[in-house]
Amino acid sequence: MKKFCLLIVAFFYVVCASAQTRTDTLVNVLHDPNSRRVLVVSHRGDWRNAPENSLQAFLNCIDMGVDMIELDLKKTKDGVLVLMHDDTIDRTTDGHGKPSDYTLAELQKFHLKNGMGFVTFHHIPTLEETLLLCKDKILINIDKGYEYFADVYKLLVKTGTLKQVVIKSGYTLDKVRSDNGDVLDKVIYMPVINLNEAGAEQKVIDYTNIKPVAMECCFSTATPEVLSLMKRIKDSGSKIWINSLWPSLNAGHDDDTAVDLCKPDDSWGWILDSGASIIQTDRPQKLIEYLKTKQRR
């Protein structure tokens, strides 16, 4: 009888464990300021091997083991949120004009271009399609999309993806509360702060009072004041997010230094030493490989 009971307990343990999704694990890491695991964010998806902000770019990231994708939003003439970085579709599709010039049906007749500018068979995805694709598989960061905060919130509720999506902006806490105070505590919100700008310290102070999961720190020069503010953020219990995309965001500790100059310790290593545990990159596979050598994956 005792053995039978133990088998039953073991069975239910396996069932509960299998119910845990990859996203559950990532969400736990996101909310744990003491986790050693560094979250890798892929800028506009895997845009080197698929069109930026495309479903294929996100599928590639999932297969690669990326932790979070970053995307951008625009709205169509008929009020549908779609993925698009620029104000127009000219650079990234074979069409012309603003997304708001077209209905969704009209917009999806166009084809996305890849990173080399060649037209592909991929179409502009909606935010809802993307949420459903990524559900339980990967975290999502909405970069350009603050103006659609309320619409995004409704879609997150509809698709059951509230726990895995990070919404961000560079606005003050007072403005964000004024704009979206009714749902602010129901979403994962992250402030973006340029630590070189006047008023950065006050922004940090204000946001530490609500202890967001992370603060995105941008800086063109790593002054003692900048390093002090990052320490303050980390000590408050929020994670530090640093972009390694290009030099002006990280005082020269960028992806190209890591990959093209073969100096990852001068780039990603410096970022880790600065206390960051979330890194947004254009070189996700290389960064993942590097982090494994540092036992941070």
Per-region residue spans from a language model:
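Phosphate-group recognition and catalysis centered on beta-loop-alpha active-site segments
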Residues: 19-297
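Bacterial Sec-dependent N-terminal signal peptides
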Residues: 1-23
